């Protein structure tokens, strides 16, 4: 009987590990997922992390949504965002230093996805968006790093894709795992 009870408790705990009530979300929370995009395996290999996509919770007239850079910067319902995660791999994190004023996300809406992973070029990739929103509020959520520091840059297939997209080894970038590690301390 004890063994059965133990197995049931483990199963319940495992199924609830990512249970987040939307009512407990706060503006500025960061949501990480293991994406199913075509570039996700490269990001995973290069950063050695399953967190290959992220977004930030913002307060909209329709309630809390996840602001994400996908094909364009857009608002996505929380359930839909986490529902797109591979194998239900997702988590939320709240930075210790939180944003104290409303996030002005509207200026980012509609910006195209940044295939070159460059800062300040009118396009946006997911972790750049989160990083910039915190920067807009005077908070350095994490440090950027050179593209050359990512393990994936040593893979021939990735190097070829980087050359095609005009990605320099010397340019600065921020990966979802950089934000995750910085706010999970």
Positions of the model-derived regions?
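Conserved catalytic neighborhood of penicillin-recognizing serine enzymes
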Residues: 67-98, 102, 161-177
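Glycine-rich catalytic cores of cysteine/serine-nucleophile enzymes that process amide/ester linkages
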Residues: 33-92, 111-124
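Sec-dependent N-terminal signal peptides
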Residues: 4-13
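Loop/turn positions that initiate beta-strands
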Residues: 27-28
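Activation targets extended, charge/polar-rich intrinsically disordered C-terminal tails
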Residues: 121-185
């Amino acid at each position: 009987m004890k063994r059965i009870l133990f197995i049931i408790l483990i199963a319940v705990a495992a199924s609830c590990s990512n249970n987040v009530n939307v009512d407990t979300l706060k503006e500025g929370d960061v949501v990480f997922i293991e994406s199913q995009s075509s570039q996700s395996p490269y990001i995973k290999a290069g950063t050695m992390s399953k967190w290959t996509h992220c977004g930030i919770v913002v307060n909209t007239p329709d309630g809390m949504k996840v602001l994400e850079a996908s094909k364009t910067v857009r608002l996505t319902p929380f359930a839909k965002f986490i529902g797109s995660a591979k194998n239900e791999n997702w988590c939320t994190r709240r930075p210790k230093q939180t944003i104290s004023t409303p996030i002005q996300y509207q200026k980012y809406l509609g910006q195209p996805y940044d295939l070159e992973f460059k800062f300040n070029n009118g396009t946006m990739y997911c972790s750049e968006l989160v990083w910039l929103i915190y920067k807009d509020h005077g908070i350095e959520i994490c440090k950027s790093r050179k593209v050359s520091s990512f393990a994936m840059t040593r893979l021939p297939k990735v190097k070829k894709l980087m050359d095609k997209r005009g990605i320099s080894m010397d340019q600065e970038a921020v990966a979802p795992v950089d934000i995750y590690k910085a706010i999970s301390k």
